[in-house]
């Protein structure tokens, strides 16, 4: 049990300056110091910097069984998770089987609202009726002991490919390919689920060559599938270092040339310049639409977008995902609006609480993480939102079954929590663990389930747990202090040598002191975004922040009064034009 929960206040300081050259300083700040380290980071090599796939546990077993199934024409089931890692992973193995001329398989993606995460007995029985002999999981399975035993009893061999932590030992599967296995000797422990599938494909290709029976496609053609690997790696927010950096780097290269109809149509619809697509385009534009499929309907819709071979079909799924993503935005906005009203009423009647706990049985659990994040950012405290799953989402024919909610399930509330950046949520929930059925997540985000009769005591339990907070005011280290005159095409080009950015390789953070916000503007359909022109007297640059109000920064941001800005530097490509600008992080 964690006895202390750390509350962090934002305090900025600049990392020690070692080099005048910006790129050298940024590399040094990331612990990249030797010439060999610099070369490896700045020049990812697809051959030299990827590990042997057979270093993954059980890879030989998995490859042997899959090759046997392909040779004998056995029917294979591919069971993947419903998120923006699992769906591309399912599409990846789908496309690989098509590439080698194997068609006797089916993709199964569970309904998020009805079946939930991982394997389930109803779905396995559906696959057994479809005469599946080999079941391959993607981005799930490592904890599904009972379900895998059930699949075996129904005559299936099971190969698990996953990247999550094991629990209570390993399931009795034929093969478990997972870099996080306790006995794994694989050099990289954190790769996404689709990344594990890519390693499986590489192993299958190498094994076929070694056996003198190479697959019937031109050497290197499989690399066109890296667009899905890059998409999933960036979507799943794994650390973009080591092998992940290589996969993301080359994944983006392939995405910029992608022949995938669905993605090309999606880029066009969103006015994304495919030649300049970045990790931000993936994270803010593409990933939400893939995730919208499971949150608002069925994940199969996103899968069909990624695997579409007909232009009309691809166009239809682009429009559908865009529509349900817009519906998702409206629903999240509605939840946020209702939650704010409840918060205001509670403050008026009970006073302010250090933890916000709110819910409504009509709120859809799949949307609550997005809503909780918005509220936590505005109110600067941990937020726990709960709702109840509704068992009404139809299944797509051939990809799943259906089930009715049991009385026990109807009595369970599910929710999401988000931190304001100050409180470790897992530690907080650990102290109040007797109130949950289950919980999990990370320091800043998590999920939980709770019995209906216990929801009314959850707020008090979390508030009591939050009394074990120590304020140590840690510093946020900034890469460098710059002036507006330092921003140029050349400096941006230097910074972008470090891309792609993400977890483990965050965008460089800079401080700009004593700059003047000349004009503060709002933009967007509902004026939900912020745009500011900054001047130092000689130079002017635009800075933006999405879904932000100037009021959030208090007295630190006033038009016509000099301020200190913490920001990233970026180059934006949109609708055929480019712009160097700042992305606002904070003011002080």
List each language-model region with its residue ranges:
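Active-site cavity-forming subdomains of large catalytic enzyme subunits
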Residues: 128-194, 198-207, 241
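Hydrophobic helix-and-loop "lid/oligomerization" segment in the mid-to-C-terminal part
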Residues: 7-9, 15-134, 154-155, 172, ...
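A short acidic, amphipathic alpha-helical/loop segment
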Residues: 146-150, 371-374, 494
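Histidine-centered active-site/metal-ligand motif
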Residues: 163-164, 364, 442, 529
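Mid-to-C-terminal polyanion-binding domains and interfaces
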Residues: 68-72, 313-317, 323-358, 411, ...
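Short amphipathic alpha-helical segments and helix-helix/interface helices
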Residues: 66, 124, 148-149, 554
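Short, positively charged and aromatic/hydrophobic N-terminal segments
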Residues: 3-4
